[in-house]
Structure formats: C-alpha cells, structure tokens
C-alpha cells in the first residue's frame, strides 16, 4: 500500500541512534550470551541442569535469536528506514523481536517465582524434583509465545511510502497500522495488560524476597555473602524490567492509539520520539540478562572469576616483563650486566 509521507510522523534521529545502539548491543550480546551458553555446556551436563538453570539457558537462547536479527535492523535504519531486503526477512525479524521480548519477560518471571519459593519455602523447594517441571514450563512458554508470534510471519509486514524528498518511494518494515483498526488496538491492549500483570507479580515476589532476607539474622560471614548475592539478583531482575521493559509498555498503548488516529495529533510526534527511545531500551535486555546469571549460579561465578584472574595475571606479567626489560636496557651502555640466574 502506498501512503503519502506527509500523512505520518517520523523520528529522523533514529537513523543514527539505532545503527549505533544495535551495533553495540549486537557485539556485547553475542559475546556475553555466547559465553554463557559455552560455560553452561562445559560446567553442567544436560541431565544435571536444575529448574532455574533450564530457565536461564532458555532465556539465553531467546536473546541469541533476537541478536542474530540485529544486522537486518542495522541495515534497515542505516538506509533511512528503507527495507530493500526480501520481505520474508522483515517478517522473520519482527517475529523474533516479539519472541525475544515476551520469552524474556516469561523466563524472568519464572526465575523470580523460583527464587520466591526458595526463600519462602526452603525445605519444600529443596525436596522438590524440579527438573521435569522446568522442562515442562519452558515448553509451555515457547509453544505459547511462538504460536502468538507466528502471526508476524504471515501478515503483510511492509508498506510503501514516499521518501522525504518526494522524489521516489521507500519500503517500511512493520511501520503501518490501518487507521481506526479495532482488532489491532485490542491486541495491543491485551499485550500491555498482560505485561503489567506479570510485572506486578514479579514486583510482589521480589519485595517479599527482599523483606524476608532482610529479616533473617546473619550469624556467619557465609550467610551474609549468600544474602548479599540474593539481594543483588533481585535488584538486577527489577532493574532489567524497569530499564528495558516498563518504558516500552508505558508508551506502547498511546503510540498505538496515535498510529491508529485515535490520539490527538498534536502529541503524535512526541509519542513517536519516545517510542523509538524505548525500542532501544527494550533491546538492551540481551546484554543485561547475562548479569543475572552471575548472582544465580556458584559455578558460573567461580568460572568467570577464574578467567578474570587469569587475565589480570597475564596483564601483570606483561607489565613486569616490560618494566624489567626497560631496567636492564639502561645499564647496557655503561657496564656489562651479569645474566640473572634462576
């Protein structure tokens, strides 16, 4: 469908913002999530993965699925929002964006509930056989979200608009809603309401965890360390939601109403600008999610700490070698230096 470019607003700063932000997220996200999968493959045989580690692996896979589409979006925005790639890639990119967003929300939700149970009912949780439940819950989440996202694979994802100069046409990807479409509005209302229901449940669970941990007396240094890590994990999960997901879902409904022509046009540009910024924030969850793993698994922290210590040691040795070479080079011009014997 061809539309006149003057009939819609555009946030031109996104053609600079998205390529920069997405490039950084792509590099950091691939490294961080790839490393997480590699560590899990090395440290944990598949049959020894407990419930929470199963959720973490699935969360990492969801992040990687989105990360592999980022080069497509980088090309799109670098080309001033003109999709010249095959249409099915636009559908695929939109589908994986949806899958990553709501798989991340779902798996962070079940991870939080797992920790909530461990804090409130430690004996019952320790005695429970949770591996099968973790696999079953993961399958339910994937089936439900992939089924919902499959709509993006079959919908008409592209539309043609006039370019800024009016001298030709460009193809947009997932940037067109039919004016006054009530089905589109209902879908977005359901998505936003569903998200905030999950967010409120996560907020409740995390507040209970914080309250319970702070009330417990700390008698040993080890217990203090465990409590500190647990509190950091809770704060990190909440930070991921507040930074990445909440802003987008607060703006999503007003933006949808504006795109459908159901919102005052005087605010359309400001809402569209805010929407672009929240899309950038939404994608940062792929980089922040791996931080959570540091507080959840002892082996992961130990492995990461060992690698960091090796890197520091190698850098220190390199500096010592350089300094020694400098010190020995100075007296050569004056008097011979006896070789150092070990």
Swiss-Prot record:
PROSITE patterns tied to this protein: G_PROTEIN_RECEP_F1_1 (PS00237), G_PROTEIN_RECEP_F1_2 (PS50262)
Alphabetic keyword roster: Cell membrane, Chemotaxis, Disulfide bond, G-protein coupled receptor, Glycoprotein, Membrane, Receptor, Transducer, Transmembrane, Transmembrane helix
Subunit structure: Interacts with ARRB1.
Glycosylation sites: 4, 169
Highest taxon, organism lineage: Eukaryota
Record topological domains on the Cytoplasmic side: 39-54, 114-133, 206-233, 297-342
Family per record: Belongs to the G-protein coupled receptor 1 family.
Name recorded for this polypeptide: Platelet-activating factor receptor
Function: Receptor for platelet activating factor, a chemotactic phospholipid mediator that possesses potent inflammatory, smooth-muscle contractile and hypotensive activity. Seems to mediate its action via a G protein that activates a phosphatidylinositol-calcium second messenger system.
Cysteine disulfide partners in this protein: 90-173
């Amino acid at each position: 469908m061809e539309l006149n470019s003057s009939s819609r607003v555009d946030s031109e700063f996104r053609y600079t913002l998205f390529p920069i932000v997405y490039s950084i997220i792509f590099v950091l996200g691939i490294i961080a999530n790839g490393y997480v999968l590699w560590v899990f493959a090395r440290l944990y045989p598949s049959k020894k993965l407990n419930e929470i580690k199963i959720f973490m692996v699935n969360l990492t896979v969801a992040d990687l699925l989105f990360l592999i589409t980022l080069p497509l979006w980088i090309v799109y925005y670098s080309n001033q929002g003109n999709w010249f790639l095959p249409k099915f890639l636009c559908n695929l990119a939109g589908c994986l964006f949806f899958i990553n967003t709501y798989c991340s929300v779902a798996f962070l939700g079940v991870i939080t509930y797992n920790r909530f149970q461990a804090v409130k009912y430690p004996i019952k949780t320790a005695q429970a056989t949770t591996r099968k439940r973790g696999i079953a819950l993961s399958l339910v989440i994937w089936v439900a979200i992939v089924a919902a996202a499959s709509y993006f694979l079959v919908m008409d994802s592209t539309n043609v608009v006039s370019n800024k100069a009016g001298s030709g046409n460009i193809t947009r990807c997932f940037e067109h809603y039919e004016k006054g479409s009530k089905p589109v509005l209902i879908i977005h209302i359901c998505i936003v309401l569903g998200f905030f229901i999950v967010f409120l449940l996560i907020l409740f669970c995390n507040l209970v965890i914080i309250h319970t941990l702070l009330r417990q007396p700390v008698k040993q240094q080890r217990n203090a360390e465990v409590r500190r890590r647990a509190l950091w994990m809770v704060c990190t999960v909440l930070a991921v939601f507040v930074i990445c997901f909440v802003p987008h879902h607060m703006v999503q409904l007003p933006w949808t109403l504006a795109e459908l022509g159901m919102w005052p046009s005087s605010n359309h540009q400001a809402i569209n600008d805010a929407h672009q910024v929240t899309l950038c924030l939404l994608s940062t969850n792929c980089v922040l999610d791996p931080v959570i793993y540091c507080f959840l698994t002892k082996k992961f922290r130990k492995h990461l700490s060992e690698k960091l210590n090796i890197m520091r040691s190698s850098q220190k040795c390199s500096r010592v070698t350089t300094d020694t070479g400098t010190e020995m080079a100075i007296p050569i011009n004056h008097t011979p230096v006896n070789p150092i014997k070990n």
